[in-house]
Each structure stands twice: as structure tokens, then as C-alpha cells.
Regions:
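PDZ-domain C-terminal substructure recognizer with occasional recognition of PDZ-binding tails
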Residues: 146-184
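Post-HEXXH active-site segment of zinc metalloproteases
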Residues: 232-258
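Catalytic Zn2+-binding segment of zinc metalloproteases
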Residues: 206-215, 223-241
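Active-site scaffold of zinc-dependent metalloenzymes
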Residues: 94-113, 129-131, 182-213
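PDZ/PDZ-like peptide-tail recognition elements
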Residues: 41-108, 174, 185, 189
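Conserved PDZ fold ligand-binding element
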Residues: 119-143
């Protein structure tokens, strides 16, 4: 859904906190950071509720698309876990808010265990304090969340990961293979979503137009399809694991300025992403019939925007979606593999 005339902040710095689904960490050169005292937690409770849905739907889709991503060596083993600590926040008001609203301390704490992902299936939940990864102590305070990212990601690539909670109880999470593209929820009233070959992003403005997970899966599936199809391969090198969690936070809340990127796709690319995105939806177990009503509603909402240069017209898009839905349903009825009928690439 990227608009050639609209910019969308989708750099990995938009992550709210340390996330085991993306060990790559933005370097100082890629983020224009706000002053260290900028406040970031206003409205955080509602944002985290929204993000939980985005992470859940994104994880399912990325798992469903893993066979396609494996062909380009773009998969990884993930736990579906986001952590944070007070050490990631420098503003006194933020720290007080997080202590009161989330009982956050300087210990490595689960901010979000993605529903139906390995960590949550192992029994982890928001608020759990983590002390060890495979027996290696995490410590607390500065650097602890970064240490967790590095240890847990390294462990996940070789098998089950043992995570020890405060009190000594250890759970074992079996990593799941997914496409390596993290899913970002960007705080912006703009109605947009994007993919740049490295990440998927949706704005809160577009998120709030969705009525259920099926509609959210339609959007994220479309963006994921852009990446799996290689419509826009990232030209920038991926960063090595590291720190800067405060930059993640500031960028997401909007008090820092990350790079804005314009990612135009051709009309043919958009049609292909619509088509393949529906297949990813179906393979992930979502209701593809939600597509028609949502696109009608979205088209009505955004028809004043100048997107026709890079997007199919509303009626053309709906007609193509209807055809794809019929095709997928026929394959489901015949118990055939849900593989899109793509033309060979030149």
C-alpha cells in the first residue's frame, strides 16, 4: 500500500523495545535522536494493546510465508518475545509512569509475549522478569536487555531456549521458523502501510480502520508479499546486534526522527502483492472473504488520495481480489496446496 508520494517511517528504529524477533539494531547514524530527556510513554497502554495484535497477526503470517522466504535465505528462528527495563528510559516521568503502570524495574522484563508464539506457549507473559538464558545470567540495568537479545537470538538458532524467571523457574521455548522481516506499528494518523525489503509497517491510523484480525492480516499479508516477492530489495546493509533501545522507544512514540523513506511500486507489483498476500492469509488460517468488504471501506476512506499512479483502481482491485478468492477457495475445497499461480520471472 506504499504511496510514491507519501513517506512512512519504517526503519527498524521504530521498534518500541528490545525484540527477539529482530536482533538487528539501528546504529546512531540511522536515527536522528531527540534529547535524552524527551518523554515517550504518553498513551503507551493503548499502544501496547494495539501492538499485541499486530505482533500476533504478523507472526502467524511470517510463519506461513517461511517456505517462500527460505528460497532467498530470509528466515530465522524466533521466540516471539519483547522485553524492556527501566534502564531503557532516561526521562524521570517515563520511569515513574512505567513503575506505576507496569511495575517495571531495572530487571529484564517481558513487555509482550506474542500470543500463540513459542514464548507464550512456554508460559511466559507480560510482566515476567527474566534472569538467565540457557543458564547465562542477564544481570540488570544498562545493557541487560541488549544482552538478552544477543543471547536469546543466538540460542534460538540452534534449538530450544531455556529461559529462567525470577524465583528460579525455567521454561523451555521451542523457536519457530518465520520470515525474518519484523512487523512494526508506527504511531501516525496517516492511513498507510509499507514494506522495504527488510521490515513490514502499518500506521496506527490504518490499524484503527481494521475491525478484526482478518482485515489486519489482509494488510500485513499484502506488505509481506512485497518482501517475499523481492519487489524492493533493501540496499542498506543490516546492522549487527547491539543497543540503542532508547532510540527504539523515542522513534516509535514520535519524539525522535527516523529516516523517512518513499517506496514506490508499480501497478503490476501492487496487483501481485494483493494476489500473493491473499494466499499468505489463507495459509495462515485467516478468512480471505474479509478482503472485499475491507477494500471497499478503505477505498471509500482514501479515495481522495492521489494513489492511482502506483495502485490499481478501486474497481480493478476488487475484481482481481474476487477472482483470487474464488481461486483459493477452489483449491481449499479440492484440498490442493495453497500455492499462487505466478508467472515465471524473466
Amino acid at each position: 500500500m506504499s504511496n510514491a508520494r507519501q513517506s512512512l517511517v519504517i526503519a527498524a528504529a521504530l521498534l518500541l523495545a528490545a525484540c527477539t524477533s529482530t536482533p538487528e539494531v539501528i546504529s546512531p547514524s540511522t536515527v536522528a535522536t531527540a534529547p535524552q530527556t524527551a518523554r515517550v510513554t504518553a498513551g503507551l497502554e493503548s499502544y501496547m494493546q494495539q501492538r499485541a495484535r499486530v505482533e500476533r497477526v504478523g507472526f502467524r503470517l511470517r510463519h506461513a510465508a517461511a517456505p517462500a522466504c527460505a528460497k532467498t535465505n530470509e528466515t530465522k528462528a524466533e521466540l516471539g518475545l519483547i522485553v524492556w527495563s527501566l534502564a531503557n528510559f532516561s526521562n524521570d516521568e517515563d520511569r515513574a509512569h512505567l513503575q506505576g503502570a507496569f511495575a517495571l524495574t531495572n530487571a529484564v522484563t517481558v513487555a509482550l509475549a506474542v500470543a500463540d508464539a513459542p514464548a507464550s506457549r512456554a508460559g511466559l507473559k507480560a510482566g515476567d522478569i527474566l534472569t538467565h538464558v540457557d543458564g547465562v545470567p542477564l544481570g540488570d540495568g544498562k545493557g541487560a536487555t541488549e544482552r538478552f537479545i544477543q543471547l536469546s537470538n543466538a540460542a534460538a538458532q540452534s534449538g530450544p531456549v531455556r529461559l529462567t524467571r525470577a524465583g528460579g523457574k525455567t521454561v523451555v521455548a521451542e523457536p519457530q521458523i518465520v520470515c525474518e522481516f519484523p512487523t512494526l506499528l508506527v504511531r501516525s494518523p496517516e492511513i498507510n502501510a509499507a514494506a522495504d525489503g527488510r521490515v513490514l509497517a502499518i500506521t496506527t491510523g490504518l490499524f484503527e480502520l481494521t475491525h478484526n484480525d482478518d482485515e489486519l492480516a489482509l494488510i500485513l499479508g499484502h506488505e509481506l508479499a512485497h518482501n517475499t516477492l523481492g519487489h524492493l530489495k533493501a540496499t542498506e546493509p543490516k546492522e549487527k546486534p547491539g543497543g540503542l533501545l532508547d532510540a527504539f522507544v523515542r522513534a516509535t512514540i514520535g519524539t525522535a526522527v527516523a529516516k523517512a523513506v518513499t517506496r514506490p511500486y508499480s501497478i503490476e507489483n501492487e496487483k501481485e502483492a494483493d494476489y500473493v498476500g491473499l494466499y499468505l492469509m489463507a495459509r495462515a488460517g485467516y478468512n480471505i472473504t474479509a478482503a472485499e468488504a475491507f477494500w471497499r471501506r478503505l477505498n471509500e476512506t482514501t479515495r481522495a488520495q492521489a494513489v492511482t499512479a502506483t495502485h490499481p483502481s478501486g474497481e480493478d482491485r476488487l475484481h482481481a481480489l474476487q477472482g483470487a478468492i474464488s481461486e483459493i477457495k477452489a483449491k481449499q475445497k479440492a484440498k490442493q496446496p495453497l500455492e499462487p499461480n505466478l508467472k515465471p520471472r524473466q
